[in-house]
Amino acid sequence: VQGLKSKDIASVPAANAVDNLSGKLAGVYVTSGSSGPTASSNVTIRGQTSLNGNSQALFIVNGVPITNGLFSPGDGLNGSSTIDFGNGAQIINSFDIENISVLKGPAAAALYGSRAANGVIYVTTKTGKNSKGWGVSVNSNTVLETPLKLPNFQDQFGNGGGGKYSYNDGATYTGDYYDAFGENWGPRTDGQLVKVYNSNGDAVPFEAAPDNMRNFFQTGVSTNNNVSISHADENGDFRFSGTQLNRRGIVPNTDLNRNTLQTSMGKKLFNNRLEFRANAMYVGSGSDNVPNAGYDESSSVMYSFLWLPRNTPIDDLRDYWKPGQENVQQSYVEELWGNNPWLIVNENTNSFNASRLLGDINATYHINDRTNIRLRSGQDMKNDIRQYRRATSTKK
């Protein structure tokens, strides 16, 4: 059995508690998601052990098993959509962790059954036992993030086909005009004067816009604030904790807001021979928009960038509705396929509002110094409402 104490993760606790395990325990592998504020993290012990790809360890919080899997990833509208609303263990609050134990191999299955065949991550939350009278704790951290690495695009050629480009209407391909192509097989971007979709008939330089993707993404900010109150005496203890997490993603208009309330109460009776302990955790979380990490035309920003003409500056697309046709027809360099990236992040949103209640109660009777009897009951309940919006004129 390996383990981590609260001090091992207290310096910079991760917004997703699963990420606290990364690089700290032998044989424990954490694969962190990269799809935005709600991104899931996968945990395997001793590598992949299943041919069906399900090698995730079982998470147990104060004796209550919870699943770390994804529930219905996607938007239900397109099979190529991959929308990561977060993994089950994401609800665990890093500030409330007392210790984490890792059980490997047959020992885990022997204790917790077949669900633990891939190992167990056992999380014990904090109580008020270590308090001397009253105690108050305040914690806060802020983390900034930017894209680690962006794809390399060619900038020698721009919109068109067969080395040619001529503006028609962005929607009709007649064989003579190539502005309807969502590809970069046009002429070299040498600054020659051409008409484009938003130049109102005027000729503008045919030049590359190499920083489109960098100018589109923003600096992500994650702020995590926690306040806890605890008390202990010879008859029992209690602890109450409140945590607020606000995350802004690197993709514009993506976020995660999560509020966590956690309490633990203990009581000793009959000269400490009988002990009661109750733990409860409520998590309310939501997002106005979760980014699509898949290859889906209707809501994937990366899909749009792959087809965006290299001579079209991303800032020219900020006004994503055609004048006089707001909320009806998007404004984009081409109308045969592809969607304006700004339309995607502002109108084609994937939102959710979830609440989860996790709790347990146990009673322990100490017969003697070596023998005790324990009764335990636990409950894990979740309610999750999701909404997918797709604007009119969206290509799918």
Mark where each language-model region is.
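Extracellular/periplasm-exposed beta-strand and loop segments of Gram-negative cell-envelope proteins
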Residues: 151, 212-218, 291-293, 333-353, ...
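Conserved protein kinase catalytic core
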Residues: 68, 110-111, 285-287, 384
